[in-house]
Amino acid sequence: MTVQEAQTGPAPRARAAFHPLTVASVDRLTDDSVAVTFDVPEGLREAFDFRAGQALTVRRTIGGQEHRRSYSICAAVGRRPRIGVREIPDGLFSSWLVHDVRPGDVVEVQTPTGSLRADPAEGGRHLCIAAGSGITPMMSIVSTVLTHPAAQVTLLYGNRTSGSVMFAEELADLKNRYGPRLDLVHVLSREPRDVELFSGRLEADRLRRLLAALVPVDAVDHAWLCGPFGMIADSRSVLDELGLQADRVHFELFYVDEPPPELHRPEAVVTGDTSDVTIVLDGRTTTAAMSRDASILDGAAATRNDLPFACKGGVCGTCRARLCDGEADMRRNYALEQAEVDQGFVLTCQTFPVSARVTVDFDA
């Protein structure tokens, strides 16, 4: 393996970094979920400023191996960062956060990341569709955009039962505070409602009927989606049918009990065993020969152990970088919007080198 390093020209943009944060509070939401709020020291306040829709990555070491998980921020902009966590059976992180973490504990937390960002200055009409723990980014988006006096929000929130609704009291408080500007609709799949339309899963047919009855889609400025793969796919399909432009639909995927989706396109046919891959990060350039059978993120780990990542599943967007030179194959993408892809951005955890030389810039 050959490695070359050099310093690049302009100063790089600020990169997400880990810092030890003290847990301020752990609030029980349901039997299997909590909200964890962090204290941020004065010197890190600016670094941990977040936009509605962004996420925090939590890091811990178990048995000498580093693990990371990304969790959506569920606080209004300007408040202390807070994440919502629902336990996954035998989950390495979720069980720890739900049952073991206490106020006063110190946790390694990365500064906010993510391209799912709502701008409260825009006002407008917003449609939010969430299922289960997909409500977490919606808590930040809804509470933030409604600070604009002209903003309106319709939130369709799917759960199994009323007892499994995360942030039930806070959602009721938001409804009381904003009245007719917030239309809150609970849809339950395992608990009968008085209205049949509100009983069942948020699948395509029910979404069509809900939107026809409640939401003039042609007046929607932005749609925000968060939940499991099936709900996201159905929501995007229905909104497309109803004429909402794709660049107005923003989504975040949660993988819970979902089979891996099919590749979005066939794998590229490559020749040769390796590519010379150049990594630009924090103003430092590193070039190394890497196998074409490994993702750029995994292949570069041997020479650059400072690369940003979290889920490694093409979902969180933490490993986003711009493909500046060469050809590469991004096999899955559930984090970048089409505009970002058109600008050359890729998820390095899902991108494999194809050409003899490839350059990706994390500072772009």
Language model region names:
Residues 227, 253, 279-281, 290-292, ...:
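Active-site proximal loops enriched in glycine and acidic residues that flank catalytic Cys/His/Asp
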